[in-house]
């Protein structure tokens, strides 16, 4: 145990024989006041009544500490005057590039509900391939996940397996035989190279931009020391080879441009007195020029260019213009267009059937009338030939037994067949307005043709025998008979187009229908008879029959 207590100062307390600890010193003075006696002794630390905290002093201390802390932060922290344009914002070289001023207006992006998200992803329905986002992939895209590091074959790219595939060696990879050369330290480098070599005697290695100690830089003269007489003709202006081309001397006299009132404007307009024709301005006109004003629309003669006046100047005829006599004839195979709905409906079929029946009846009536007319003409022609033959026989009989009267005038001997061909002369195409003239009335007796009912027992005189030249009048009467038949129908016309009556006083007709008894009451509207009805119809829908 003595080893444990070695090196320590051991103090042993002595027993005082049981002295009383409460015994006071003989010189003790009780200097405790009444207040200290009541609130505790000052000799005992922490005893007694503690005083309350002074709030005003505490607030003042906190304010002083806060002020000191703020001043310290302003001194050590970043200053707001730097980087934002300097003090007062006028130092542009210190302006922060990423800072914007109060005039900056930021453009807010649209809300998701306002953005048209169909753009840029193939357009609407994804079919606009030209608007497909290049970085967007569709649902058919299959991303290939990269292999884990444990799955990769690192033997490739480093010389292949076992390092013998030299064509696969990585260019940036070095092998174990590579020996890297460490760069020398700054203290080991020889800086004598490049500045003239060692000792500055290798002139071929001298740095071009380096100068030696013998170099003496010439300071540029001040503006007040420069001689500006060079370059403007040299000193005293006598060195003309050094004269500035753009500089003018004191002997230069600038010629001012003449005022508008002083210029001679007679040049370029024919010269002086207007006789220099080669100098005359081509676009200038003289005082003898008379401007001809264009005529008003009401004064222009629009007869030019459409065949000239009265349409007789063929060389001025407009190639694209057509005359009034060029009427496009509608082909006879015209068929009235029927809508598809009308073809399928039964009512329209019935109506079409009735219309077809009516057309067929009209065509049959027309054919019957033409056949009856042809038969009547053939019958009348046969009767005329018989009457002519009888007259010729009577003439021959009279010629064989002439009477005792004075000798008659000689009768021209005509071949018997000549009267037959003579009847072709009166049959000529007559104009359509023939029916409007009064019909000449020819009696059958005057023509020398007896009636069919009174041929028997009728004695013929010799007067028609010697006046056989009046026989053509009979055929003229025949034509007049047919003209009278046509004149009963009045002016006729044939329909070019179909027309449906729009009112009760109008008539309807189809193409190729014949309108008779036409009355031209107006230029655009006529009145006539067609299909048993009498009324108005447009004149440009029909064509008059010749």
From Swiss-Prot:
Q: Quote the tissue specificity entry.
A: Expressed at intercalated disks in the heart (at protein level). Expressed in most tissues, except in B-lymphocytes or plasma cells.
Q: Which SMART domains is this protein grouped with?
A: SH3
User: Known post-translational modifications?
Assistant: Acetylated. Phosphorylated by FER. Phosphorylated in response to FGR activation. Phosphorylation by SRC promotes MYLK binding. Phosphorylated on tyrosine residues in response to CHRM1 activation. Phosphorylated by PTK2/FAK1 in response to cell adhesion. Tyrosine phosphorylation in transformed cells may contribute to cellular growth regulation and transformation. Phosphorylated by PKN2 at both serine and threonine residues in a GTP-bound Rac1-dependent manner in hyaluronan-induced astrocytes and hence down-regulated CTTN ability to associate with filamentous actin.
Q: Name all SH3 domain ranges.
A: 488-546
Q: Where are the Cortactin repeats?
A: 80-116, 117-153, 154-190, 191-227, 228-264, 265-301, 302-324
Q: Which GO terms describe its molecular function?
A: Arp2/3 complex binding; profilin binding; proline-rich region binding
Basic and acidic residues: compositionally biased ranges:
357-396
An annotated GO cellular component of this protein is: mitotic spindle midzone
In the record, Phosphothreonine modifications are located at 401
GO biological process annotations for this chain's record?
actin cytoskeleton organization; cell motility; dendritic spine maintenance; extrinsic apoptotic signaling pathway; focal adhesion assembly; intracellular protein transport; lamellipodium organization; modification of postsynaptic actin cytoskeleton
The alphabetized UniProt keywords are: Acetylation, Cell junction, Cell membrane, Cell projection, Coated pit, Coiled coil, Cytoplasm, Cytoskeleton, Endocytosis, Endoplasmic reticulum, Isopeptide bond, Membrane, Methylation, Phosphoprotein, Repeat, SH3 domain, Synapse, Ubl conjugation
Q: Please give the Pfam families that the UniProt record associates with this protein.
A: HS1_rep, SH3_9
What Gene3D superfamilies does the annotation carry? SH3 Domains (2.30.30.40)
User: Its principal location?
Assistant: cytoplasm
Question: Where in the cell?
Answer: Cytoplasm, Cytoskeleton; Cell projection, Lamellipodium; Cell projection, Ruffle; Cell projection, Dendrite
The annotated consequence of residue 466 to F reads: No effect on interaction with KCNA2, but decreases KCNA2 levels at the cell membrane
Q: Which domain of life is it from?
A: Eukaryota
Entries under CDD domains matching the protein: SH3_Cortactin (cd11959)
UniProt cross-references to InterPro entries, sorted A to Z: Cortactin_SH3, Hs1_Cortactin, SH3-like_dom_sf, SH3_domain
PTM sites of type Omega-N-methylarginine = 119
Q: Where is this cross-link: Glycyl lysine isopeptide (Lys-Gly) (interchain with G-Cter in SUMO1)?
A: 144, 181, 218
Subunit organization: Part of a complex composed of NEDD9, AURKA and CTTN; within the complex NEDD9 acts as a scaffold protein and is required for complex formation. Interacts (via N-terminus) with NEDD9. Identified in a complex containing FGFR4, NCAM1, CDH2, PLCG1, FRS2, SRC, SHC1, GAP43 and CTTN. Forms a complex with ABL1 and MYLK. Interacts with SHANK2 and SHANK3 (via its SH3 domain). Interacts with PLXDC2 and SRCIN1. Interacts with SAMSN1 (via SH3 domain). Interacts (via SH3 domain) with ASAP1 (via Pro-rich region). Interacts (via SH3 domain) with DNM2. Interacts with ACTN1. Interacts with FER.
Return the protein name.
Answer: Src substrate cortactin
Per the UniProt record, the source organism is Mus musculus
Q: Which gene encodes it?
A: Cttn
